[in-house]
Amino acid sequence: MEQVMNVQPLTHKDRPALEAMDTGIEDDYVVRIFERLIESDSHELFGLFREGKMLAVGGYSLFGSGKFAMLGRLRSDRRSLMKGNATELLQPIVDQLFRDPMVAWVGANTHLHNHAARRVLEKLSLNQGPVLHFLTLKSPKLLTAHESGPVWEEVTDLQHKKELIHSTEMNELGVFPFECYYPLPYDNALFTDQHLEKSSFYQNPDASRFVIVKSDTKKFDYSHVKYFWNDHYNQPGFFETILHHWKQHPDHVGCWIDFSAEGFKNIPDLSPYDVQEPWMLYGKWK
């Protein structure tokens, strides 16, 4: 007799079922911040259940006043892998999101070499997007072969910030790195006054380049660098500028920088960085 599986949003009563899953993830942050996730207005978490047991968990986060939905936090019980549980969980979630009149885009960010996750996303009809490299600059004394220069001039005027950010819709990253781990389509819905006011903008002397640095927390605190070109090492003062921001925030563990595939190739020496496996962004517009 076939056992019925069902997908349902998680509530406080589901914590024991979540903790009983064998995911192989030590100190899983989803368990650690479970209550925060299920109580949030911008995050949803769902479970795939069979006879009261949770086989998989996953959900989404909303950005840009609900215009963008990023799938994530997918975990499966290792005792029931390769049974299609991830797709079984995510398909109704994606269907629900595309029925939501507020949502215009659904996406997911996964490791380039995570072929199992990529197969799931392709089954969900999400399209491949750019490959991105997330590096954290932690040892600036090891930086070599970059053009030194003065710290770029800070831009504090809100209107000037808007003009700058609207000038780079077509950029070499192919995305807007909204938060650490969360690259999104470059869209005005993300550029609220509040977001821009909390972001530090710096412009180089000939006004041909600018960089945005915003404090962000993903377990640790980072100076999150948003730069839309691939010439990090050729722009005088670029590294002095982002290190200036880090020095103003000594509690940060480093400068998190999103590099395109081409920008990553241009790095002469990776020793100053913590280097993650490359990521691929998937997504689909309505």
Where are these regions (language model features)?
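Non-catalytic interaction/regulatory modules that flank or connect domains
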Residues: 149-233
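Conserved beta-strand-loop-alpha-helix junction that forms the acyl-donor binding cleft
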Residues: 106-118, 256-265
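Conserved beta-strand in the GNAT
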Residues: 47, 53-61, 70, 203-216
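Active-site rim helix/loop that mediates acceptor-substrate recognition in acyltransferases
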Residues: 23-51, 59, 170-201
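Short amphipathic alpha-helix that is part of the acyltransferase structural core
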Residues: 1-32, 141-183
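A conserved beta-turn-beta hairpin within the catalytic core of GNAT-like acetyltransferases
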Residues: 62-72, 81, 214-225, 275-278
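Conserved catalytic-core motifs of GNAT/GCN5-like acyltransferases
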Residues: 109, 127-143, 272-285
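Conserved acetyl-CoA-binding loop-helix of GNAT-fold acetyltransferases
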Residues: 76, 82-97, 119, 234-246
